[in-house]
From Swiss-Prot:
Its EC number is 2.1.1.199. One of its GO terms (molecular function) is rRNA (cytosine-N4-)-methyltransferase activity. This is Ribosomal RNA small subunit methyltransferase H. Pfam families: Methyltransf_5 (PF01795). One of its GO terms (biological process) is rRNA base methylation. It is found in: Cytoplasm. Specifically methylates the N4 position of cytidine in position 1402 (C1402) of 16S rRNA. S-adenosyl-L-methionine binds at residues 49-51, 68, 95, 126, 133.
Length: 353
């Protein structure tokens, strides 16, 4: 797809990953007996709007708020979802800005319900770079085409991949390649980058890809996929502060969830999945000290897991949509709430059973 070609949400590359399963998981709180008349769903990574469209079609009484930091994605999703009228609202923010977005709509007199009173009934965060961004060649996310080393999900943000390559010290560059890309040759690549940038600053992706081919040993290039994959992933995560955002958004999103509401995360690489797994584990376990024969009052978990381990796409879906192959899905629902305060839910979201 050319860089200036309008995005086609209906093309095969833009089929929402695990579409029906996301409808089922997010819908647990929407269809619960305690659900309000107009339940609210938050799509924290709106992208092209495929998952949001599925939610709006499946649950005719639901309202969906879509968040995205990319203004191009927001514009295309708004056009795609215009037919749903006042059932779809959008807001530009990094996904850990969910609280800011919900506060905004709480103050909006045109929003149909009181979010502070009602809370949200479900949310989805489909992490990583979107199919739309990968297919927009001038964004610099894809290593198979030559493009400016940008990689910003929000074009108004400052830091680019080129700036990282041209300004980071050796130790910091090696650290992000190792931590965010699990790159075994991080130190060697960092040395090569610093040596080459002294000749000429990095601007385009093809030069970086050539450097990686020249730096990574031939035996290592024959396994583990494209030799640029890990470095490009690491740069993208650093540019967009993806892991920091994820660590912040998990407690923030669950704090707005009403009783019986479900929260879902779709991860595409091990660092994301590890963060989600660890935080959900802590949220769904009792805080009673180990060794006591009974659970102490007030220490019972507020949430329970909806997935056993991490769910994956089916073999059939992977065959039809290769971008679903790495996905790992984890979900939890709120089963109780204690009084608002330190460490507690922001609002008294009590079931109406």
């Amino acid at each position: 797809m050319a860089a200036n070609t309008p995005h086609d949400p209906s093309s095969p590359g833009h089929v929402p990953v695990m579409r029906q399963r996301m409808v089922e998981l997010v819908g647990i709180g929407v269809t619960a007996g305690s659900a309000p008349a107009q339940p609210i769903i938050v799509d924290g990574t709106l992208g092209a709007g495929g998952h949001t469209e599925a939610f709006l079609e499946a649950y005719p009484n639901a309202i969906v708020i879509g968040l995205d930091r990319d203004p191009n994605a927001l514009a295309e999703a708004r056009a795609r979802l215009e037919r749903f009228g006042q059932r779809f609202f959008s807001y530009q923010t990094r996904f850990d800005g969910i609280g800011e977005a919900l506060e905004h709509f709480s103050e909006d007199p045109d929003f149909p319900v009181d979010i502070r009173e009602q809370g949200i009934s479900g949310f989805l965060f489909d992490l990583g770079v979107s199919s739309m961004q990968l297919d927009q060649e001038d964004r610099g996310f894809a290593y198979r085409v030559d493009a400016p080393l940008d990689m910003r999900m929000d074009p108004s943000s400052r830091l680019t991949a080129a700036e990282i390559l041209n300004t980071y010290e050796h130790g910091e560059l090696a650290r992000i390649l190792k931590r965010y890309g699990d790159e075994k040759f991080a130190g060697k690549i960092a040395s090569a980058v610093i040596r080459e940038r002294e000749k000429q600053p990095f601007e385009n992706s093809a030069r970086l890809v050539d450097l990686l081919y020249a730096t990574i040993p031939a035996a290592a290039r024959r396994t583990g996929g494209h030799p640029a994959k890990r470095t490009f992933q690491a740069l993208r995560i650093e540019v967009n502060a993806e892991l920091e955002s994820l660590e912040l958004v998990i407690p923030a999103a669950f704090s707005w969830l009403r009783v019986d509401g479900a929260g879902v995360f779709m991860s595409y690489q091990s660092l994301e999945d590890k963060i989600v797994k660890q935080q959900l584990k802590g949220m769904t376990e009792s805080s009673t000290p180990p060794g006591l024969p009974v659970e102490l009052p007030g220490t019972e978990p507020e949430f329970e897991l909806l997935t056993r381990g991490a769910e994956k796409a089916s073999e059939q879906e992977i065959a039809e949509n290769s971008r679903s192959a790495p996905v790992r899905v984890r979900a939890a629902r709120r089963i109780g709430a204690h009084a608002s305060g330190a460490g507690g839910p922001r609002y008294p979201l009590v079931s109406t059973h």
